[in-house]
Design a protein with these regions (language model features):
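Transmembrane beta-strands of outer-membrane beta-barrel pores
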Residues: 8, 22-28, 61, 78-84, ...
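Outer-membrane beta-barrel translocator domains and adjoining extracellular loop/strand segments
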Residues: 29-42, 84-103, 135-150
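Oxyanion-binding "anion nests"
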Residues: 23, 46-92
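Short loop/turn motifs that connect adjacent beta-strands in outer-membrane beta-barrel proteins
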Residues: 9-18, 62-72, 121, 171-173
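Outer membrane beta-barrel transmembrane domains
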Residues: 121-174
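Transmembrane beta-strands of outer-membrane beta-barrel proteins
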Residues: 16-20, 55, 70-76, 112, ...
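Residues on the lipid-exposed face of transmembrane beta-strands in outer-membrane beta-barrel proteins
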Residues: 2-8, 55-59, 112-116, 126, ...
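Residues that define the transmembrane beta-barrel architecture of outer-membrane proteins
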Residues: 1, 49-53, 104-110, 158-162
Length: 174
């Protein structure tokens, strides 16, 4: 696992930081529950290689580097996960029987937000975040051993969510 951050000041009122992180693991029989195409709850397992890349950044502004009265903070992160290994369907043989095949996937997620303190004790902000199920290659589906409907949680999903913030804090300790 690796992580690195750099940053600095821009004038007397602005600071920034950017980072890059890489995490890797090799799970063995990492399980998750799903409901297959027959409506039966099944437990599936993944074994293989998982890699996660994270990019992050923050920009802070405060007049004369004094955030007590007015300040603004812009930050965001991007995540990308890739997996390569084997997928075991229905490890408990609760439905269509246990089957195994290859599995490759890439998913991503991100958020960006800005928070502005316009006077002591008051802040407003906006955040937008999203996930992307990305691309998957499921050997059991590609060979026709299972229908994609048997693994619905691995299907495409790309939610987006906007969030507004209005905050009043009666003290600096919240």
């Amino acid at each position: 696992n690796l992580s690195s951050h750099v940053g600095g000041d821009v004038g007397a009122s602005t600071a920034w930081q950017a980072g890059l992180s890489y995490l890797g693991t090799s799970p063995q029989n990492r399980t998750y529950r799903d409901v297959d195409s027959t409506g039966t709850e099944v437990t599936n397992g993944f074994s293989g290689r998982t890699r996660l890349l994270v990019l992050d950044g923050v920009l802070k502004w405060a007049p004369n580097n004094n955030p007590a009265h007015t300040n603004f903070k812009l930050q965001g992160e991007y995540f990308r996960r890739s997996e390569n290994g084997g997928l075991t369907y229905d490890t408990q043989a609760a439905s269509l029987g246990t089957r195994s095949g290859s599995y490759r996937s890439r998913q991503s997620g991100w958020y960006a937000q800005g928070v502005y303190q316009f006077m002591p004790e008051w802040r407003v902000g906006y955040r937008y975040d999203g996930l992307n199920a990305g691309t998957t290659s499921i050997g059991l589906v590609n060979t026709g051993a299972l229908a994609a409907a048997a693994l619905p949680i691995l299907g495409g999903y790309a939610p987006r969510r906007p969030t507004l913030l209005a905050d009043w804090s009666s003290s600096e300790f919240g």
